[in-house]
Regions:
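Mobile, glycine/GP-rich and aromatic-enriched active-site lid/loop segments adjacent to catalytic centers
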Residues: 81-106
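Conserved beta-strand segments of alpha/beta enzyme cores
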Residues: 21, 85, 115-117
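Glycine-rich active-site loop/strand segments that organize a redox cofactor
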Residues: 40-90
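N-terminal Rossmann-like FAD-binding beta1-loop-alpha1 element of flavoenzymes
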Residues: 1-24
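Short N-terminal binding/cap micro-motifs at the start of the first secondary-structure element
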Residues: 8-10, 31-34
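A conserved short coil-to-beta-strand element within the FAD-binding core of flavoproteins
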Residues: 120-123
Length: 123
């Protein structure tokens, strides 16, 4: 897998936890850098109001199918399992109470639980 951002780490963790052998490659010296700076350092980690109509796609069935399999509520359940405190800012926008680093650490822990191998920084 290429890229240790939110999507890359989530995908790598899921694949690893399903028994796949995963190598996650990141070119930057820190993983989850965009997560770390999002929301002013508090990480707007999901939006409970986001549905298929919120996304532009050539194939609207893809988004419907993807969100039916793993949506904002699923990610929120993961956040809560890891004990990350959060609050709703407005219209379903969920932010960490403290720091976005909690989400980065959570995703890293999920990857480790799945046995994901890491290569970083990778030129």
């Amino acid at each position: 897998m290429i890229g240790a951002g939110a999507a890359g780490m989530t995908c790598a963790a899921t694949a690893g936890q399903r028994g796949r052998r995963v190598l996650l490659i990141e070119h930057y010296h820190r993983v989850g850098e965009k997560i770390r700076i999002s929301g002013g350092g508090r990480c707007n980690f999901t939006n409970t109001g986001a549905g298929p109509a919120s996304y532009l796609s050539q194939n609207p069935d893809f988004c419907r199918s993807a969100l039916a399999r793993y949506g904002p509520r699923d990610f929120l359940a993961l956040v809560e399992r890891h004990g990350i405190r959060w609050h709703e800012k407005k219209l379903g926008q969920l932010f960490c109470d403290e720091t976005s680093l909690h989400v980065v650490r959570m995703l890293r822990a999920e990857c480790d639980r799945g046995g994901v191998e890491w290569r970083q920084p990778c030129p």
